[in-house]
């Protein structure tokens, strides 16, 4: 069995758009051929796709750099470059993705569902696209936009209908093997289950997924034991099967402490539906403890079983199936499409004076224009200068005290300011 990995950070790098082409028609008997450079193709996107056959993020742990291909450059004779193929990465159901600013990109909940993680850059326009009445033969083109590059935080919350809840060594692993097709490791010591075990349970025409989660202990909400690793997986379970061992010194105290940990982790979990199970009814003195436990819980239904002896298992399975029919599945989390730049967050340009006396220009809009410019093409550089004036950069530089002969740096490009 592969190791269980439920959190990983990966670098995603979508493809850059292909460059536009500078070309002209040069054919016999065509006196004024005009521009004929095609546009570049779009860079490849990066998608995650849900795969019900996966239950861990271990593939991402050993592949922390995910890249998509670049778009094809435009060609002569008006030929546009092909879009790059998109990159698809298979992930388990329950995968949640955040960008490097902690914005939620989305989550993968269904088999075959695709989630856009990083968007490929637009292809640059060829010189054919810039022809106008004022410039019938443009001799410049755009370079393709960069694809998105960032560190993505990927988490897995086990996607199960039912989560087994309880102290270590209450018999959860034995129970899941009795009610489902799961093959859990079983031993008589704490924390036998170090990672979630999933099993499919069939009850007549119904079927549901149950998860045996790592045992919970007191102060788990503070990260003690496997606390936080466990608790985040509880969030996605529609029903919690709260198992209390009747060979405990104080079953009621165990029950109350586990519920307290849930509430301290997330107040909303106090309203999560629970089915309370009294396990190990085969041990000596269990019946007396069960009666006292049931009396203390008053109106809460308690189902007595012995997972070891296979007693009460069918009754429990029917109870779970009946309860699940009354509880809807979770709606997806609200997402923030990180690749959509909010108007209030976009900055055309920022001017700072560096320690070396050089005036530095940065900004969102400026970055896009800069990357689209071919600085080996004089006409493209002149167009970039016109775009800077259009943004008001020339006036802003003078307001910041820039004078004739000063050096101005725009990202990796330096030029001398001339009045």
Curated annotation (Swiss-Prot):
Main location: cytoplasm
CDD domains listed in its UniProt record: Obg (cd01898)
Documented EC number(s): 3.6.5.-
Record-listed GTP binding positions: 166-173, 191-195, 212-215, 279-282, 306-308
A GO MF label: magnesium ion binding
Gene3D superfamilies in alphabetical order: GTP-binding protein OBG, C-terminal domain (3.30.300.350), GTP1/OBG domain (2.70.210.12), P-loop containing nucleotide triphosphate hydrolases (3.40.50.300)
Domain OCT per the UniProt entry, residue ranges: 341-419
Pfam families the UniProt entry points to: DUF1967 (PF09269), GTP1_OBG (PF01018), MMR_HSR1 (PF01926)
Any one GO CC term of the record: cytoplasm
Segments forming domain Obg: 2-159
The keyword Cytoplasm is annotated on this UniProt entry: yes
Signal sequence coordinates: none
Record domain OBG-type G: where: 160-325
Cofactor: Mg(2+)
Keyword line: Cytoplasm, GTP-binding, Hydrolase, Magnesium, Metal-binding, Nucleotide-binding
Function summary: An essential GTPase which binds GTP, GDP and possibly (p)ppGpp with moderate affinity, with high nucleotide exchange rates and a fairly low GTP hydrolysis rate. Plays a role in control of the cell cycle, stress response, ribosome biogenesis and in those bacteria that undergo differentiation, in morphogenesis control.
Subunit field text: Monomer.
Family: Belongs to the TRAFAC class OBG-HflX-like GTPase superfamily. OBG GTPase family.
Protein's UniProt name: GTPase Obg
Gene source species: Acholeplasma laidlawii (strain PG-8A)
Lineage, top ranks: Bacteria, Bacillati, Mycoplasmatota, Mollicutes, Acholeplasmatales
């Amino acid at each position: 069995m592969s190791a269980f990995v439920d959190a990983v950070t990966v670098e995603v790098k979508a493809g850059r758009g292909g460059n536009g082409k500078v070309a002209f028609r040069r054919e016999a008997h065509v006196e004024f051929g005009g521009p004929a450079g095609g546009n570049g193709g779009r860079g490849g996107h990066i998608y995650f796709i849900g795969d019900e056959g996966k239950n861990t993020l271990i593939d991402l742990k050993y592949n922390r750099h995910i890249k998509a291909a670049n778009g094809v450059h435009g060609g002569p004779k008006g030929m546009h470059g092909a879009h790059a193929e998109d990159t698809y990465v298979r992930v388990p159901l329950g995968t949640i993705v955040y960008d490097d600013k902690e914005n939620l990109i989305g989550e993968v909940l269904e088999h075959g569902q695709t989630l856009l993680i990083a968007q490929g850059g637009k292809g640059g326009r060829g010189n054919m696209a810039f022809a106008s009445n004022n410039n019938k033969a443009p001799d410049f083109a755009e370079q393709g936009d960069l694809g998105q590059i960032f560190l993505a935080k990927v988490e897995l919350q086990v996607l199960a209908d039912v989560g087994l809840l309880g102290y270590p060594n209450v018999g959860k692993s034995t129970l899941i093997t009795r009610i489902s097709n799961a093959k859990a490791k079983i031993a008589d010591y704490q924390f036998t289950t170090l990672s979630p075990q999933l099993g499919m349970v069939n009850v007549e025409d119904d079927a549901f997924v149950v998860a045996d989660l790592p045992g919970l202990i007191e102060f788990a909400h503070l990260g003690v034991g496997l606390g936080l690793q466990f608790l985040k997986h509880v969030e996605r379970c529609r029903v919690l099967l709260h198992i209390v061992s009747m060979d405990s010194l104080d079953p009621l105290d165990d029950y109350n402490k586990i519920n307290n940990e849930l509430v301290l982790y997330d107040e909303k979990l106090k309203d999560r539906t629970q089915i309370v199970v009294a396990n190990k009814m085969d041990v000596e003195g269990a019946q007396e403890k069960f009666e006292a436990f049931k009396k203390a819980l008053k109106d809460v239904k308690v189902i007595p079983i012995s997972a070891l002896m296979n007693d009460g298992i069918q009754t429990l399975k029917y109870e779970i199936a009946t309860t699940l029919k009354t509880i809807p599945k979770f709606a997806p989390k609200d997402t923030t499409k990180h690749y959509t730049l909010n108007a209030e967050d976009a900055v055309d340009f920022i001017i700072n004076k560096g320690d070396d006396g050089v005036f530095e220009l940065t900004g969102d809009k400026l970055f896009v224009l800069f990357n689209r410019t071919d600085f080996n093409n004089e006409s493209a550089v002149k167009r970039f200068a016109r775009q800077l004036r259009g943004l008001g950069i020339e006036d802003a530089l003078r307001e910041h005290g820039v004078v004739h002969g000063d050096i101005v740096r725009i990202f990796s490009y330096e030029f001398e300011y001339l009045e």
